[in-house]
Design a protein with these regions (language model features):
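Extended, Lys/Arg-enriched charged tracts that mediate electrostatic binding to polyanionic substrates
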Residues: 68-75, 128
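Active-site loop segments of alpha/beta catalytic cores
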Residues: 1-30, 34, 87, 93-96, ...
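Structural motif
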Residues: 57, 89-90
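Catalytic and substrate-binding clefts that recognize carbohydrates or anionic sugar/phosphate headgroups
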Residues: 105
Length: 365
């Protein structure tokens, strides 16, 4: 992130539990930490922000129970509606798919609302921050961990509450609804990020897709009108607390048309550079002096369907094309799922680990 050629290319991994188990078996070790040590990689999220900066939802705890499963969000508390359907603390209903591995969105509390005020949206007074958070972050840093505080992308929070089709139509037909809902979301998410920044997080940011593989989902002009100024205000407020804090955004899809805007706001870490719709080497050439490319491995082509040698070739190509002068954190472009052969994962990450960076020119010197 300092845009200097490092001693090695940092690598990061986010993987489903089934994949972690398969890698442990492949390397004949008894913990995923040992897998990471072998690969020279870090885990994407060791501690989730919502586990250390929580929200109070009156009455939820009394009704909720822990529901386990291999799907995203498994192992947390929900209100069970039937054998496969449950409601979270926000009032969002989801259903476990027939294979038991994924969940689908069913409904949200604002689906039929005419005004966001019809929903009891949590304000900043409902934030429950760990008073020992600064000490915890300090201890993590002393262990050599890079600490990030990341909240849900406000667009993602909004569509989950409202329904995606409804909320996208609101951008066109009911802009006041969008503006009012966003004001509530940004006030809450911004305060959580300010808490993380003040506590000493190295990086803060937003996690949630705002693009398809063709374009920004609400359109770049609408994003600039509605989303950009609000994102900019949150970034400014965090930078007032710590001017050196790194600013991160995660969105799958093609966000190249708004990359200059994100850079202008202050986003310096872009995750991922999804190779199916953005060429990492082109992004590096055009924007690489201003951003860090964070995860670029193909999860639609090479990792699930390539050979181990093709995985090695992709990894080496990314190091050679994007690693000059630093500004690169490599990894699969999203969560590694059970459709990826373990041999391919090992080949990809080992190729990055074993690459001799001495052959790359350091243009920062």
């Amino acid at each position: 992130m300092a845009h200097r050629l490092p001693d090695r290319i940092p690598t990061i991994m986010d993987a489903r539990d089934e994949v972690k188990d398969a890698l442990m078996e492949y390397y004949a070790v008894d913990s995923f930490d040992k897998v990471l040590e072998i690969l020279g990689a870090e885990e994407m999220y060791r501690f989730k922000t919502d586990e250390i900066v929580k929200l109070h939802f009156p009455g939820f705890e009394e009704q909720a129970e822990r529901i386990d499963g291999p799907w995203m969000g498994g192992g947390q508390k929900y209100v069970r509606l039937d054998e496969s359907t449950f409601q979270d603390a926000w009032g969002v209903v989801r259903r476990i798919g027939s294979d038991g591995k994924f969940v689908e969105w069913v409904s949200g509390p604002l689906v039929d609302a005419s005004d966001p005020d019809e929903y009891d949206f949590p304000g900043v007074d409902r934030i429950i921050a760990d008073p020992d958070l600064p000490d915890r972050i300090r201890s993590w840093k002393e262990r050599g961990l890079f600490v990030r505080g990341v909240v849900s992308q406000p667009y993602k929070t909004a569509w989950i509450l409202r329904g995606m089709e409804n909320f996208l139509m609101d951008y066109i037909l009911n802009r006041p609804f969008v503006e009012k809902l966003y004001d509530k979301i940004y006030a809450l998410q911004g305060e959580i990020l300010r808490i993380c920044t003040a506590a000493g997080a190295d990086l803060i940011g937003f996690d949630g897709d705002i693009a398809t593989q063709n374009s920004v989902v609400m359109g770049p002009d609408r994003w600039r009108e509605v989303d950009k100024p609000r994102l900019a205000a949150v970034v400014r407020s965090c930078r007032k607390i710590n001017p050196e804090v790194h600013i991160f955004i995660h969105s799958d899809g093609d966000i190249r048309e708004i990359l200059p805007d994100l850079i202008e706001i202050g986003f310096g870490v872009i995750d991922p550079i999804q190779p199916e719709c953005m060429d990492p080497e082109e992004v590096k050439r055009e924007f690489g002096d201003r951003i860090t490319l964070h995860r670029c491995g193909s999860l639609q082509r090479t990792l699930p369907f390539g050979t181990p040698e093709e995985c090695r070739q992709e990894a080496r190509r990314l190091v050679e094309g994007c690693g000059i002068d630093g500004g690169l954190v490599l990894g699969a472009s999203n969560t590694v799922s059970f459709d990826v052969p373990v041999e391919n994962i090992a080949a990809w990450y080992e190729a990055v680990r074993d690459y001799d960076l001495g052959s790359l020119p350091d243009q920062s010197r």
